[in-house]
Swiss-Prot record:
<keyword id="KW-0963">Cytoplasm</keyword>
<comment type="function">
    <text>Serine/threonine protein kinase involved in the cytoplasm to vacuole transport (Cvt) and found to be essential in autophagy, where it is required for the formation of autophagosomes. Involved in the clearance of protein aggregates which cannot be efficiently cleared by the proteasome. Required for selective autophagic degradation of the nucleus (nucleophagy) as well as for mitophagy which contributes to regulate mitochondrial quantity and quality by eliminating the mitochondria to a basal level to fulfill cellular energy requirements and preventing excess ROS production.</text>
</comment>
<dbReference type="GO" id="GO:0005776">
    <property type="term" value="C:autophagosome"/>
</dbReference>
<keyword id="KW-0813">Transport</keyword>
<feature type="modified residue" description="Phosphoserine">
    <location>
        <position position="365"/>
    </location>
</feature>
<keyword id="KW-0418">Kinase</keyword>
<dbReference type="GO" id="GO:1990316">
    <property type="term" value="C:Atg1/ULK1 kinase complex"/>
</dbReference>
<feature type="modified residue" description="Phosphoserine">
    <location>
        <position position="551"/>
    </location>
</feature>
<feature type="modified residue" description="Phosphothreonine">
    <location>
        <position position="590"/>
    </location>
</feature>
<dbReference type="Pfam" id="PF21127">
    <property type="entry name" value="ATG1-like_MIT2"/>
</dbReference>
<keyword id="KW-0472">Membrane</keyword>
<dbReference type="GO" id="GO:0034727">
    <property type="term" value="P:piecemeal microautophagy of the nucleus"/>
</dbReference>
<dbReference type="GO" id="GO:0000045">
    <property type="term" value="P:autophagosome assembly"/>
</dbReference>
<feature type="region of interest" description="Required for Cvt trafficking">
    <location>
        <begin position="880"/>
        <end position="886"/>
    </location>
</feature>
<dbReference type="GO" id="GO:0004674">
    <property type="term" value="F:protein serine/threonine kinase activity"/>
</dbReference>
<dbReference type="InterPro" id="IPR022708">
    <property type="entry name" value="Atg1-like_tMIT"/>
</dbReference>
<feature type="modified residue" description="Phosphoserine">
    <location>
        <position position="647"/>
    </location>
</feature>
Length: 897
């Protein structure tokens, strides 16, 4: 066994690797992604034989789905050999890593030609000559010469034809996955070029499809429903979560060809739902920029590829037989310039320099950190790392003076903004949808793994008391617990901060949930806990619950029990006096419950407040208001709304809500385990507030949902780290329930945030149409009030605690006062969190600040300065004061009992 040697002292590769053709030497790191590092390398025995070495750490593939994606890629690449597909030379596995020895493409990927052309013409000797021989149609946009377009179209078609013969669909065709190898290496003329199986123009860089992490075997008649691909190049049927077949690749080909011609994708939007709406609204009418001179035959082909309905879209056989795809390109081949091109190609090979090394600065885009081999490094799903490099949503969040200045400066460069938007959108897709897949996959794995008969106990600073979680378990659940060997009476431990009160002194949340509203129907707690508990956790009648039990898999009969969620949530919130910051605890079986419960409590109070805002935007139906005992009451917020709607309002629905309702009523699944049942009972109307107030409400709700997503994402990452480091793949029922609760809230927050984004964009469009025509876009935007997450939580926490104190003085509803004080404390603790950029367990959660970029140190400092030290001192004083009130209240309650 020989070592992979490394000439670059900045990195270290010391793992043993035996290859059939000899040992390999890793030279310079050329790409680094979420799960892999890509090195430029060569055969140790022959330095002229260059390879790309993709090192994938097993430790990073904690999710079974990620490991499966890598295994799929390896299996596919082993089976396919084609001149226009990046080849797998060798593959080795060790106990800690995978090594994929792959064909080396020194010219990066297609995005270099599209986005970095001017820099390449100045610095890259070969590409400078190529662009001189095949000049772009315009200096003002990123379109390529017709020779490039047709050559790469034919090479794409050749590779796809081969994939179809193997019943393979790639599912992620995009410029970043189309790598370019140096021409005139291994052949010297057109004849030898075509004899090797290549198509197209022999003296242009050769296009090769890479990254088969999303690919799968899919016969022409089969349908898939996994959300894969990058949104700007994704077929509409995938964007709309519909089943799709191999024709999805043809749509992606159409978008790539359009971008090669025009320099920009055919459709752009800030999220995949907006993108789908734009595509559908276009009604198969593809608009080509006026600066693009494209012949009718090529336009017709692009339009046939970009057909909305897959059934009407051009088929593979028709595509392969198309006149443009089969056009003779020999007239573009430059025999006279062959010696010069051949000499410069050999110079590139001999210099052994990657394309990015020729540029003045390492390109942060179009390929982010990977410089041409991003697709290889990010491959088995481009999942977790995107959380630290991109944003969930684009609506306003916590703003600073710095970020506002950045926004204003960026608005002066529309072209730059469009490129940044494209790249940001591609990353956003990874954040939202792939993280959702990861969260649900992990929750399913934990749920199905079984329970540990020795449950993990909850550590507290005082005595532990095991109390009955639910005295009214159904026979089904009773039997299930017995089969699993765990007593349902050991599922939760309530604790008191001041002595030995009986654990049964407090009524269950099911008994109390309607009385919660007596705290004050207009404040946040009544809405947050009343609405969230009754509408979102419960509300199903006995018959519906029985139907769910009979139709659900065994593990879900208990784990998704709404009564269990009621008790779990309440007791976590009430355990505020045992708050331990997760960062101070070691991640092991002893502390996992404390860590997850602290994070779950923070997520719940933020989520609950987001629900208040959501219910103001989309009011509850009359039935639900009756269930929650909120009829005929009005909010006292500055954004006060009437909860009752005139019957006429129910007849008016806007397009966004119609779409949302259709999804809800069909309980469409957004990734495994993600359903819309929680929101399927919404009423059919929006409130009739002024648009400016509705926009503010949407902004506030989105910011709160995003913060909840950030905490929930961190919780699932902590769970993932613990789960995959654990020797035993089993856990207590308590941990299992916590994981399922985190999954449910993550999916719901994600769904509602997406919905609100669509709503706020519609509101902004309508609002903009009402302002004076001479008002500039910047003036319009500046009218929106900035939203600060910390201020939202701080103000609401004080409001809740003041109302609780007022009721305590009257001696009313002491149980609810206790819950109110605890909720207030959790909110204040959450407002002090600075963990949006770091994570004690080595991974990054979602960012909640839209305008910050993870690599910008100055922005991070500005973010943390939203609360200065004086602000923090004030908040800590309030925490101490409210905690003292809570302690006194509990002593009073214990004395009464």
């Amino acid at each position: 066994m020989g070592d992979i040697k490394n000439k670059d002292h900045t990195t270290s590769v010391n793992h043993n690797l035996m290859a059939s053709a000899g040992n390999y030497t890793a030279e310079k790191e050329i790409g680094k992604g979420s799960f892999a590092t890509v090195y430029r390398g060569h055969l140790t025995s022959d330095k002229s034989q260059h390879v790309a070495i993709k090192e994938v750490s097993r430790a990073k593939l904690k999710n079974k789905k990620l490991l499966e994606n890598l295994e799929i890629e390896i299996a596919i690449l082993k089976k396919i050999k084609h001149p226009h597909i990046v080849g797998l030379i060798d593959c080795e596995r060790t106990s800690t890593d995978f090594y994929l020895i792959m064909e080396y493409c020194a010219l990066g990927d297609l995005t270099f030609l599209l986005k970095r052309r001017k820099e390449l013409m100045e610095n890259h000797p070969l590409l400078r000559t190529v662009f001189e021989k095949y000049p772009p149609p315009s200096e003002n946009h990123n379109g390529l010469h017709r020779a490039f377009v047709l050559s790469y179209l034919q090479q794409l078609a050749s590779a796809l034809k081969f994939l179809r013969s193997k019943n393979l669909v790639h599912r992620d065709i995009k410029p970043q996955n189309l790598l370019l190898s140096t021409p005139l290496i291994g052949y010297h003329d057109s004849k030898s070029f075509h004899e090797l199986g290549f198509v197209g123009i022999y003296n242009l860089p050769i296009l090769k499809i890479a990254d088969f992490g999303f690919a799968r075997f899919l016969p022409n008649t089969s349908l898939a429903e996994t959300l894969c691909g990058s949104p700007l190049y994704m077929a509409p049927e995938i964007l709309n979560y519909q089943k799709y077949n191999a024709k999805a690749d043809l749509w992606s080909v159409g978008t790539v060809v359009f971008e090669m011609c025009c320099g920009t994708p055919p459709f752009r939007a800030s999220n995949h739902l907006e993108l789908f709406k734009k595509i559908k609204r276009a009604n198969d009418v593809i608009t080509f920029p006026s600066y693009c001179n494209i012949e009718p035959e090529l336009k017709e082909l692009i339009c046939s590829l970009l057909t909305f309905d897959p059934a009407q879209r051009i088929g593979f056989e028709e595509f392969f037989a198309n006149k443009v795809v089969n056009e003779d390109l020999s007239s573009y081949e430059l025999e006279d310039d062959l010696p010069e091109l051949e000499s410069k190609s050999k110079g590139i090979v001999e210099s052994n320099m990657f394309v990015s090394e020729y540029l003045s600065k390492q390109p942060k885009s179009p390929n982010s950190n990977l410089a041409g081999h991003q697709s290889m490094a990010d491959n088995p799903a481009e999942l977790s790392d995107a959380l630290k490099n991109s944003n969930i949503l684009t609506a306003p969040a916590v703003k600073t003076d710095h970020t506002q200045a950045v926004d204003k400066k960026a608005s002066n460069n529309k072209y730059h903004n469009s490129l940044v938007s494209d790249r940001s959108f591609e990353r956003e897709y990874v954040v939202v949808e792939k993280k959702s897949v990861e969260v649900n996959s992990l929750a399913d794995e934990v749920a199905q793994a079984g329970f540990n008969p020795n449950p993990i106990k909850h550590p507290t600073s005082t005595q532990n008391q095991n109390v009955l979680l639910n005295e009214q378990f159904s026979p089904n659940n009773q039997q299930y617990f017995q089969n699993q060997g765990e007593n349902p009476r050991l599922l939760r431990a309530t604790s008191s901060s001041s002595g030995g009160s009986d654990g049964s002194r407090r009524p269950s949340l099911v008994d109390r949930r309607l009385s919660i509203s007596s705290l004050n129907p207009s404040n946040a707690l009544s809405r947050a806990l009343g609405i969230a508990s009754t509408r979102l956790f419960g509300g199903a009648n006995q018959q519906q619950q029985q139907q769910q039990i009979t139709s659900s898999p065994p593990y879900s009969q208990t784990l998704l029990n709404s009564q269990l969620f009621h008790e779990l949530t309440e007791n976590i919130i009430l355990r505020i006096d045992h708050l331990q910051h997760p960062e101070t605890l070691k991640l092991d079986n002893t502390n996992i419950v404390s860590i997850l419960e602290s994070l779950a409590a923070k997520a719940f109070v933020v989520y609950s407040y987001a629900e208040v805002k959501f219910s103001q935007i989309v009011p509850l139906s009359t039935t639900l208001k009756g269930m929650a005992n909120f009829e005929n009451r009005r909010s006292m917020d500055s954004n006060a709304i009437a909860e009752e709607q005139d019957s006429d309002d129910a007849e008016e629905e806007d397009e966004t809500l119609k779409k949302y309702k259709e999804d809800c009523l069909s309980t469409k699944t957004f990734g495994k385990g993600r359903t819309l049942s929680a929101t399927s009972q919404l009423s059919a109307t929006f409130n009739k507030l002024p648009r400016s107030e509705m926009i503010l409400l949407c902004n506030e709700a989105i910011v709160l949902y995003m913060k909840a997503l950030s905490i929930l994402s961190k919780s699932m990452q902590v769970t993932s780290n613990w789960w995959y480091e654990s020797q035993e793949k089993s856990c207590s029922l308590r941990v299992n329930v916590l994981v399922q609760w985190l999954r449910e809230k993550f999916n719901e927050c994600l769904e509602k945030a997406d919905f609100l984004r669509l709503k706020i964009n519609d509101l902004r469009f309508k609002h903009a149409s009402e302002v004076a025509e001479n008002q500039t876009l910047e003036e319009k935007g500046s009218s929106e009030e900035p939203v600060y997450l910390e201020k939202l939580l701080y103000d609401r926490a004080l409001e809740i605690s003041k109302m609780a104190a007022h009721m305590e003085l009257k001696g009313e509803n002491l149980y609810n006062c206790e819950l109110a004080y605890a909720t207030s404390l959790w909110m204040l603790e959450t407002s002090l969190d600075d963990d949006d950029f770091t994570n004690a367990y080595g991974d990054y959660p979602f960012k909640t600040n839209i305008h910050l970029k993870s690599n910008d140190v100055e922005d991070k400092e500005k973010y943390h300065s939203v609360l200065d030290e004086n602000d923090r001192i004030i908040i800590r004083k309030y925490i101490d004061s409210i905690a003292n009130r809570l302690k006194i209240l509990r002593q009073k309650m214990n004395h009464q009992n």
